[in-house]
């Protein structure tokens, strides 16, 4: 590409015209082109910037490799944000943690992690830690199906509380690999839900709820070896079990560190709490101390409250 530049001779302010008076200057100006080289321009540094090979989930990855000494010796090898993420670090140890209510988002995350670990290595166990108050039945059944789909054994461990659908997932682990910590709690009950709207819509919701109840009772019966009638009776109300009761019931196989001194929180001797003054006023019903403003023991029993012995 060329450009033609003409400078008038009458322009005295132009220094080129002053040097060449009475002449018209007409010369081309060409764009400067950088010659191509055979090798790209590069900068070499005395310090090597080569990155170590990327770790995979199936590799033998150890958190202790990120020690202070190793970072001081190799400042170019600092752990990335993804590597320091607790979920990512647990996945490298084949650990999945369910630490919230069971909903659709939590179920999607747990299912994807289970399928990923099973695809990485189907010969090694997957450990599912549970500390959940329960939640959606459909979301929990999705996790249950993913656990059964995995070729690898899924070991379940209860930390804190495994209630409702959390207890169901705890009991659904591989036989012989279901555990509870000694201070944890397990709670089982029948499905909960609400129904509203038109009578037809309510009947549909109630029928669906009864379907889930029968299905869960059948699975619990197969897991624990108890008849469905007993499961239905035991789950009629909230049924809280300590780790040893859950083991005897068939929900788990063992209590971790059972009998280790100092690990188990002290349990009361079973002595009932002292009775209040209200109880004394109830007992003297019909005497001079009778307070007509207090409900009688008979009315409490009729309203659904069991009498206290």
From Swiss-Prot:
Tissues where this protein is expressed: Mostly expressed in leaves. Also detected in stems, and to a lower extent, in roots (at protein level).
Superkingdom of this protein's organism: Eukaryota
Stretches with biased composition (Polar residues): 292-309
Induction pattern: Repressed in darkness. Accumulates during leaf senescence. Induced during cold acclimation (at protein level).
Residue list for modification N-acetylvaline: 71
Phenotype on disruption: Delayed embryo development and seedling lethality. Can be rescued by adding sugars to the growth medium.
Catalytic activity: Hydrolysis of proteins to small peptides in the presence of ATP and magnesium. alpha-casein is the usual test substrate. In the absence of ATP, only oligopeptides shorter than five residues are hydrolyzed (such as succinyl-Leu-Tyr-|-NHMec, and Leu-Tyr-Leu-|-Tyr-Trp, in which cleavage of the -Tyr-|-Leu- and -Tyr-|-Trp bonds also occurs)
Residue interval of the organelle targeting sequence: 1-70
Subunit structure of this chain's protein: Component of the chloroplastic Clp protease core complex which consist of at least 16 proteins: CLPP4 (3 copies), CLPP5 (3 copies), CLPR4 (2 copies), ClpP1 (1 copy), CLPP6 (1 copy), CLPR2 (1 copy), CLPT1 (1 copy), CLPT2 (1 copy) and 3 copies of CLPP3 and/or CLPR1 and/or CLPR3. The core complex is organized in two heptameric rings, one containing CLPP3,4,5,6 in a 1:2:3:1 ratio and the other CLPP1 and CLPR1,2,3,4 in a 3:1:1:1:1 ratio. Interacts with CHIP.
Function: Cleaves peptides in various proteins in a process that requires ATP hydrolysis. Has a chymotrypsin-like activity. Plays a major role in the degradation of misfolded proteins. In the absence of CLPP3, modified ClpPR core(s) could be formed, albeit at strongly reduced levels.
Protein name: ATP-dependent Clp protease proteolytic subunit 3, chloroplastic
Species name: Arabidopsis thaliana (Mouse-ear cress)
Taxonomic path: Eukaryota, Viridiplantae, Streptophyta, Embryophyta, Tracheophyta
């Amino acid at each position: 590409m060329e450009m033609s530049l003409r400078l008038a001779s009458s322009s005295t302010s132009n220094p080129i015209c002053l040097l060449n008076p009475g002449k018209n200057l007409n010369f081309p100006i060409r764009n400067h082109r950088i010659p191509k080289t055979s090798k790209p321009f590069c900068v070499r540094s005395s310090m090597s910037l080569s990155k170590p090979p990327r770790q995979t989930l199936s590799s033998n990855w150890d958190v202790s490799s990120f020690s202070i000494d190793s970072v001081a010796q190799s400042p170019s090898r600092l752990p990335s944000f993804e590597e320091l993420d607790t979920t990512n670090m647990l996945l490298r140890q084949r650990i999945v943690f369910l630490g919230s209510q069971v909903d659709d988002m939590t179920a999607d995350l747990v299912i994807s992690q289970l399928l990923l670990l099973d695809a990485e290595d189907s010969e090694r166990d997957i450990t599912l830690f549970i500390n959940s108050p329960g939640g959606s039945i459909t979301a929990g059944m999705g996790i249950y199906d993913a656990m059964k789909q995995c070729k690898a054994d899924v070991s379940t461990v209860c930390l804190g509380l495994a209630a409702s659908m959390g207890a169901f997932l705890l009991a659904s682990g591989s036989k012989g690999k279901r555990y509870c910590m000694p201070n944890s709690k397990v709670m089982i009950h029948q499905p909960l839900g609400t129904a509203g709207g038109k009578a037809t819509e309510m009947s549909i919701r109630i029928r669906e709820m009864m379907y889930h109840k029968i299905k869960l009772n059948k699975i619990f019966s197969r897991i624990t070896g108890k008849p469905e009638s007993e499961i239905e009776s035991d789950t009629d109300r909230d049924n809280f079990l300590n780790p040893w009761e859950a083991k005897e019931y068939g929900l788990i196989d063992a209590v971790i560190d059972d009998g280790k001194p100092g690990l188990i929180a002290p349990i009361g001797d079973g002595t009932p709490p002292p009775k209040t003054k209200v109880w004394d006023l109830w007992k003297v019903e019909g005497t001079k101390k009778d307070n007509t403003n207090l409900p009688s023991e008979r009315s409490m029993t009729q309203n659904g409250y069991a009498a206290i012995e």
